């Protein structure tokens, strides 16, 4: 009987410890204005050296590793590899959530039209490329929905993010 009670208490302690780790982890923390602003400043500072920024988790990890091996700006700003990935992801999701769907649709329509007009591609290549874009759009719309909780924090930074990420792409 005591052995069962001890085992149950051990499981409970393990569950509480796990819950503590989960809720104490960067993923459980809400995006702060300070972190979002730091992320945008770091993109601006690192983009000339690392190239045009386009968000995904691999790029987030790559930028962290490259910066850690060089200037260490991300770490100096207070981010670990994990907290950088989380803050960057939440900032980008929040940015997407601030963008009207009509604007995103217009951006991708322009891209599809440009591909359709490329004479150097065969019709099959055009179709394949446009299909790949459509898959990316679906993924972006999911990220946009996931960004709703972060939109208010990111909204003041939207013009800056737009110029950093969309400006070069849209010829601005």
Question: Can you say where each PLM-predicted feature lies in the sequence?
Answer:
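Bacterial N-terminal signal peptides that target proteins for export
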Residues: 2-13
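C-terminal segment of classical bacterial N-terminal signal peptides
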Residues: 20-27
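Immediate post-signal-peptide N-terminus of mature secreted/exported proteins
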Residues: 28-72, 148-172
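Mature extracellular/secreted ectodomains of secretory-pathway proteins
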Residues: 62-138, 146
């Amino acid at each position: 009987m005591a052995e069962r009670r001890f085992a149950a208490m051990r499981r409970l302690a393990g569950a509480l410890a796990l819950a503590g780790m989960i809720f104490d982890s960067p993923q459980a923390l809400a995006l702060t204005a300070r972190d979002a602003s730091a992320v945008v400043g770091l993109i601006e500072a690192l983009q000339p050296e690392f190239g045009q920024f386009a968000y995904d988790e691999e790029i987030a990890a790559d930028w962290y590793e490259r910066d850690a091996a060089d200037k260490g700006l991300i770490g100096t700003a207070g981010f670990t590899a994990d907290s950088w990935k989380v803050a960057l992801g939440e900032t980008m999701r929040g940015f997407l959530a601030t963008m009207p769907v009509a604007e995103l649709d217009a951006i991708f329509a322009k891209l599809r039209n440009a591909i359709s007009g490329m004479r150097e591609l065969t019709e099959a290549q055009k179709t394949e490329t446009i299909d790949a874009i459509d898959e990316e759009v679906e993924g972006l719309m999911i990220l946009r929905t996931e960004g709703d909780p972060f939109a208010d924090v990111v909204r003041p930074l939207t013009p800056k993010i737009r110029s950093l990420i969309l400006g070069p792409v849209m010829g601005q």
